[in-house]
């Protein structure tokens, strides 16, 4: 039976994602906090927080789930040609806080953002502890795009991306894919399907199939050098 759970500030297990509501799609639990151990437990089980500043913390596990397979992100011929002409630089874990701030800026026709100060503080702590990571796109010394997310074993859980120049967020996605392939990651969790993700090649999986893949790869060892801050060259 579908049901909504209410969490308190004592650490407790999340309910099974199978119990998430169908309307709104994937809402599983309300409350709790954003402590690192709770967040990591959530992602480990295919659950993530998503809420507005005026709301309590809401925990989700939607069905279907948007995912990418590293190597199958769609980098079109026209995008490759465009990126080859740009004098951009790409880095990993050089400016996590700034990337989160860029992602938190309200989008066009949006009044606010779900990446609240509370969310930013929580994920900055995860970054400090080696769990959350960023990709940066630079034009000179100016940050023009990027993305961030969490690594759970050989699964990268993407959270958000932004751009200040055309195609800069797509460039960040191309860099992420290249890096994950080199580090033998198996899955990118993109959470909720939208037209932009679909245009990049995201696939919609039944939640049960996603959880099966997550369970398969979440405990796999990762190269210790995978997330050392570095500058990378985008191979097109």
From Swiss-Prot:
EC number of the protein: 2.3.2.6
Source species: Shewanella oneidensis (strain ATCC 700550 / JCM 31522 / CIP 106686 / LMG 19005 / NCIMB 14063 / MR-1)
Subcellular location: Cytoplasm
GO biological process: protein catabolic process
Transmembrane regions: none
Matching NCBIfam families: aat
Domain of life: Bacteria
Cellular compartments per GO CC: cytoplasm
Protein's name in the database: Leucyl/phenylalanyl-tRNA--protein transferase
Entry keyword set: Acyltransferase, Cytoplasm, Transferase
Assigned protein family: Belongs to the L/F-transferase family.
Name of one Pfam family that matches: Leu_Phe_trans
Function: Functions in the N-end rule pathway of protein degradation where it conjugates Leu, Phe and, less efficiently, Met from aminoacyl-tRNAs to the N-termini of proteins containing an N-terminal arginine or lysine.
PANTHER family, per database record: LEUCYL/PHENYLALANYL-TRNA--PROTEIN TRANSFERASE (PTHR30098), LEUCYL_PHENYLALANYL-TRNA--PROTEIN TRANSFERASE (PTHR30098:SF2)
Catalyses which reaction(s): N-terminal L-lysyl-[protein] + L-leucyl-tRNA(Leu) = N-terminal L-leucyl-L-lysyl-[protein] + tRNA(Leu) + H(+); N-terminal L-arginyl-[protein] + L-leucyl-tRNA(Leu) = N-terminal L-leucyl-L-arginyl-[protein] + tRNA(Leu) + H(+); L-phenylalanyl-tRNA(Phe) + an N-terminal L-alpha-aminoacyl-[protein] = an N-terminal L-phenylalanyl-L-alpha-aminoacyl-[protein] + tRNA(Phe)
Keyword Methyltransferase belongs to the record: no
Enzyme class (EC, first level): transferase
Entry's Gene Ontology molecular function annotations: leucyl-tRNA--protein transferase activity
UniProt KW Cytoplasm keyword: yes
Gene expressing this chain: aat
